[in-house]
Structures are given as C-alpha cells and as structure tokens.
C-alpha cells in the first residue's frame, strides 16, 4: 500500500473508530463502517487538512469508499 493510502486509512480508522482490517479499497464508509453524513464531511475535512488540498463539494459528495478517497 502506498504512503498516501496508508495515511488515508489511518484517518478513516481514527475518525470512525474502526479496526484497520475492516478498511479495504471497496469498504463503504456508510454501509460497511456505520458512518453518517456528518462523519463523511469530517473525513473529507481531515483529508483536506492532511494533504493540504481543497476538495470541491461536488467531488466530496462522490467519496463513498476508501478507494474513492484522495
């Protein structure tokens, strides 16, 4: 796994309080990890902060799985 993927996975694990093994490329934040819409907004904000980027709202709405993340 790349450094970026490792960093994304760490954010997901920390923000959603899930086990690292449960986070795969196709893991749905909502369906598989029990996140709600506020959780997904917080994840996007954490990705933006970690990587020093801004994710437009329309792009943020498409981030539903670990594999969709930046």
From Swiss-Prot:
GO MF annotations in UniProt: acyl binding; acyl carrier activity; phosphopantetheine binding
Gene Ontology biological process: lipid A biosynthetic process
Major subcellular location class: cytoplasm
Reported modifications of this chain: 4'-phosphopantetheine is transferred from CoA to a specific serine of apo-ACP by AcpS. This modification is essential for activity because fatty acids are bound in thioester linkage to the sulfhydryl of the prosthetic group.
Domain of life: Bacteria
InterPro entries, per the entry: ACP (IPR003231), ACP-like_sf (IPR036736), PKS_PP-bd (IPR020806), PP-bd_ACP (IPR009081), Ppantetheine_attach_site (IPR006162)
Pathway: Lipid metabolism; fatty acid biosynthesis
Domain called Carrier: residue spans: 2-70
Subcellular location: Cytoplasm
Cellular component, GO annotation: cytosol; membrane
Keywords from the UniProt entry: Cytoplasm, Fatty acid biosynthesis, Fatty acid metabolism, Lipid biosynthesis, Lipid metabolism, Phosphopantetheine, Phosphoprotein
Modified residues (O-(pantetheine 4'-phosphoryl)serine): 37
Alphabetized Pfam families for the sequence: PP-binding (PF00550)
Family listed: Belongs to the acyl carrier protein (ACP) family.
Role this protein plays: Carrier of the growing fatty acid chain in fatty acid biosynthesis.
UniProt name for this protein: Acyl carrier protein
Organism, scientific name: Cereibacter sphaeroides
Chain's gene name: acpP
């Amino acid at each position: 796994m790349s450094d970026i993927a490792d960093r994304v996975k760490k954010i997901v694990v920390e923000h959603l309080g899930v086990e690292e093994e449960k986070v795969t490329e196709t893991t749905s934040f909502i369906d598989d990890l029990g996140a709600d819409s506020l959780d997904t907004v917080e994840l996007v904000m954490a990705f933006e902060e970690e990587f020093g980027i801004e994710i437009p709202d329309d792009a943020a709405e498409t981030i539903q799985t670990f594999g969709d993340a930046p």
